[in-house]
């Protein structure tokens, strides 16, 4: 995925998702244009 920033962290941008996918260990997210930014802290 595309890198994105979320609360000062670098995360992964997921296109057209309303929430972070399970199984990746994400514990922080930010709403993004047409998707979501998911971060593993």
Swiss-Prot record:
InterPro entries associated with the record? BDS_K_chnl_tox (IPR012414), Myo_ane_neurotoxin_sf (IPR023355)
An additional note in the Swiss-Prot or TrEMBL entry is:
A synonymy between H.magnifica and R.crispa is controversial.
Task: State if Disulfide bond is listed as a keyword.
Answer: yes
Q: Name one GO cellular component term.
A: extracellular region
Q: What is the protein name for this chain? A: Pi-stichotoxin-Hcr5b
Secreted: present as a keyword of the record? yes
- Tell me, what is one Gene Ontology molecular-function annotation carried by this entry? sodium channel regulator activity
**Where does it live in the cell?**
Secreted; Nematocyst
Question: What is the stated purpose of this protein?
Answer: Remarkably non-selective toxin, with activity on many different ion channels. Weakly and reversibly inhibits rat and human homomeric ASIC1 (isoform ASIC1a) (IC(50)=4.8 uM, and IC(50)=14.6 uM), and ASIC3 (IC(50)=15.9 uM). Molecular modeling interaction with ASIC1a suggests that this peptide hinders the collapse of acidic pockets and stabilizes nonconducting channels state. It activates several potassium channels including Kv1.1/KCNA1, Kv1.2/KCNA2, and drosophila Shaker IR.
Kindly state which keywords UniProt assigns to this record, in alphabetical order: Calcium channel impairing toxin, Disulfide bond, Ion channel impairing toxin, Nematocyst, Neurotoxin, Potassium channel impairing toxin, Proton-gated sodium channel impairing toxin, Secreted, Toxin, Voltage-gated calcium channel impairing toxin, Voltage-gated potassium channel impairing toxin, Voltage-gated sodium channel impairing toxin
What cystine pairs are annotated? Answer: 4-37, 6-30, 20-38
- Identify its protein family: Belongs to the sea anemone type 3 (BDS) potassium channel toxin family.
